[in-house]
């Protein structure tokens, strides 16, 4: 809704300039959309990080700890470290590819 007489927003062709009357609402809508996208991105990042930790814990434990006991041997510690690093490298490659694809889609 315009705060001025609608005839003052008419162009010389007699059409109203809708960008000047809807601009505040449009900007607010864009801000809400951006806020929602940011919130969703943060929630997805948290969920993905949780899934990564779960996957690393589950898979590396199963692979490296053959007989559970009170302490871990140096071999088990090294195995867990290497396993964790492998998953982190994979995570980074996949994340970079995913982010690149999302950015590419946003620019088209």
From Swiss-Prot:
Residue numbers spanned by region Disordered: 1-34
GO BP annotations, alphabetical order: protein insertion into mitochondrial inner membrane
Bilayer topology term: Peripheral membrane protein
Keyword flag Membrane: yes
Keywords: Chaperone, Disulfide bond, Membrane, Metal-binding, Mitochondrion, Mitochondrion inner membrane, Protein transport, Translocation, Transport, Zinc
Segments carrying motif Twin CX3C motif: 60-83
Gene Ontology CC terms: mitochondrial inner membrane; mitochondrial intermembrane space protein transporter complex
Positions with biased composition (Low complexity): 1-29
Subcellular location(s) per record: Mitochondrion inner membrane
Sample GO molecular function, one term: metal ion binding
SUPFAM superfamilies documented for this protein: Tim10-like
Cysteines paired by S-S bonds: 60-83, 64-79
InterPro entries with a match to the protein in the record: Tim10-like, Tim10-like_dom_sf
Taxonomic superkingdom: Eukaryota
Domain notes: The twin CX3C motif contains 4 conserved Cys residues that form 2 disulfide bonds in the mitochondrial intermembrane space. However, during the transit of TIM13 from cytoplasm into mitochondrion, the Cys residues probably coordinate zinc, thereby preventing folding and allowing its transfer across mitochondrial outer membrane.
Role, per record: Mitochondrial intermembrane chaperone that participates in the import and insertion of some multi-pass transmembrane proteins into the mitochondrial inner membrane. Also required for the transfer of beta-barrel precursors from the TOM complex to the sorting and assembly machinery (SAM complex) of the outer membrane. Acts as a chaperone-like protein that protects the hydrophobic precursors from aggregation and guide them through the mitochondrial intermembrane space.
Family: Belongs to the small Tim family.
Assembly description: Heterohexamer; composed of 3 copies of TIM8 and 3 copies of TIM13, named soluble 70 kDa complex. Associates with the TIM22 complex, whose core is composed of TIM22 and TIM54. Interacts with the transmembrane regions of multi-pass transmembrane proteins in transit.
Annotated protein name in UniProt: Mitochondrial import inner membrane translocase subunit TIM13
Taxonomic source organism: Candida albicans (strain SC5314 / ATCC MYA-2876)
Species classification: Eukaryota, Fungi, Dikarya, Ascomycota, Saccharomycotina
Gene that specifies this protein: TIM13
């Amino acid at each position: 809704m315009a705060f001025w007489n609608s005839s003052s927003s008419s162009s010389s062709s007699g059409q109203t300039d809708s960008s000047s009357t809807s601009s505040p609402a449009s900007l607010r809508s864009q801000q809400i959309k951006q806020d929602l996208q940011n919130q969703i991105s943060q929630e997805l990042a948290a969920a993905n990080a949780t899934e990564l930790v779960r996957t690393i814990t589950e898979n590396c434990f199963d692979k490296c700890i053959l007989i559970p006991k009170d302490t871990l041997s140096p071999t088990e510690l090294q195995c867990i470290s290497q396993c964790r690093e492998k998953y982190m490298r994979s995570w980074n490659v996949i994340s970079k590819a995913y982010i690149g694809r999302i950015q590419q889609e946003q620019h088209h």
